Amino acid sequence: MFQRSGAAHHIKLISSRRCRFKSSFAVALNAASKLVTPKILWNNPISLVSKEMNTLAKNIVALIGSGHPVLNKVTSYYFETEGKKVRPLLVLLLSRALSEIPMTERNHLKIDKSDVPEDPIYSKPSQNQLFQRPASSISPLHILHGIKPLNPLTKGPEPLPEETFDKQRGILPKQRRLAEIVEMIHTASLLHDDVIDHSDTRRGRPSGNAAFTNKMAVLAGDFLLGRATVSISRLHNPEVVELMSNSIANLVEGEFMQLKNTSIDADIDTIENGHKLLPVPSKKLEVKEHDFRVPSRQQGLQLSHDQIIETAFEYYIHKTYLKTAALISKSCRCAAILSGASPAVIDECYDFGRNLGICFQLVDDMLDFTVSGKDLGKPSGADLKLGIATAPVLFAWKEDPSLGPLISRNFSERGDVEKTIDSVRLHNGIAKTKILAEEYRDKALQNLRDSLPESDARSALEFLTNSILTRRK
């Protein structure tokens, strides 16, 4: 009994000492944290680029300004609410991370010494374009905008405030403009998508088409793309112009791929026009199709169930790249190009954006099954109702061949949507999609570590990459 009491007293004494030590250590940490201010709030990557993000919407509205008040209202509609703004955030954080690469390794683009502070490191004659600001215009303004003294409604966008390069922040003027361009292109795609998908809500309020009619939403999206391409051209970099212009084409290609769920489904041979289904006009020119296409059943192709699933996933991933990952990956590549980085770093930045973009869409497809429309900011379960088979459905189809006919007819018959949802839950389609998303997340993290030196900006990118898997909207 005495020994037990002694042991208990000994344990209590050790525990007391440990508590005092723990308490002392906590006090020391708290005191140290007051002396050393952390450079980044790890749970808030926006803090590193808050200056640029805070003026993003304002600068975009200035870039897209029109002399027509209704056009201004519609094009600026989606910029009035707080969206995720993931794409410009990625470009800005990546630009800061790239600035940590020594200048001696960023010698693949010339720098304009007249645009930077007096500093020997920026005054090399062989580097005279890197810090150059985007041009305000290339062609004469009266040609670009048709300005006439007697017609004050025809005018170009408002001039942007002059931004001087901040060596401590490391984001170049052209990279900042790139972030704004990316958000313009993405927002244009949202305007068009909401028309195509007959959406009623976006970001918790009426969608552009619901608020202004389909016609206004389409025209506003077109206008945004036009303004974006003008801004792209003013970056004066042929590869950047090519990449960003191509990303716009990719968005459209992805939307057309979404008309079918697999590459072996029958081609769409009608066009919906209101309540009529019109035949597609006969082809006058033969256009070469992409390599991802495979012969259809109508051409006598015989595939096993596993082969059908494999081709369906290949089709889905390629469609996902075009619709979501192309804009992200190509903007990341452009940020690296504008930084003067080496070809190896540029390639890694592109792969980072591609893997992150596919991960982002996989999570989006999961949320369509798991999150309410109110939390998501757009209608939940929309994909199935639109006849679209996403990754959770494809995983369920692998285990449940009876889903094949439902997918082929785009879930158009009574009970198809409900049966598919039940099958997804029964066969763990959501959990399997999460595992696939984690694989792409891990690849994206590796791309960052292989291409960028350790820095607060890289840590913020890693945090952002990990947070994609836990987002709820």
From Swiss-Prot:
Annotated Gene Ontology cellular component terms: extrinsic component of mitochondrial inner membrane; mitochondrion; polyprenyl diphosphate synthase complex
Gene Ontology molecular-function annotations: heptaprenyl diphosphate synthase activity; metal ion binding; prenyltransferase activity
Cofactor note: Binds 2 Mg(2+) ions per subunit.
Binding positions (an all-trans-polyprenyl diphosphate): 202, 323-324, 361, 378
GO BP annotations, alphabetical order: isoprenoid biosynthetic process; ubiquinone biosynthetic process
InterPro entries for the chain: Isoprenoid_synthase_dom_sf, Polyprenyl_synt, Polyprenyl_synt_CS
Keywords attached to this entry: Isoprene biosynthesis, Magnesium, Membrane, Metal-binding, Mitochondrion, Mitochondrion inner membrane, Transferase, Transit peptide
Binding site for Mg(2+) 2: 193, 197
Pathway: Cofactor biosynthesis; ubiquinone biosynthesis
Residues that, per the record, bind isopentenyl diphosphate: 84, 87, 186, 203
Binding-site residues, Mg(2+) 1: 193, 197
Pfam families (alphabetical): polyprenyl_synt (PF00348)
EC number: 2.5.1.-
PANTHER family reported in the protein's UniProt record: ALL TRANS-POLYPRENYL-DIPHOSPHATE SYNTHASE PDSS1, GERANYLGERANYL PYROPHOSPHATE SYNTHASE
Protein family (similarity comment): Belongs to the FPP/GGPP synthase family.
General function of this protein: Assembly of polyisoprenoid side chains. The polyprenyl synthase of coenzyme Q biosynthesis catalyzes the formation from isopentenyl diphosphate of all trans-polyprenyl pyrophosphates generally ranging in length of between 6 and 10 isoprene units depending on the species.
Protein name according to UniProt: Hexaprenyl pyrophosphate synthase, mitochondrial
High-level lineage: Eukaryota, Fungi, Dikarya, Ascomycota, Saccharomycotina
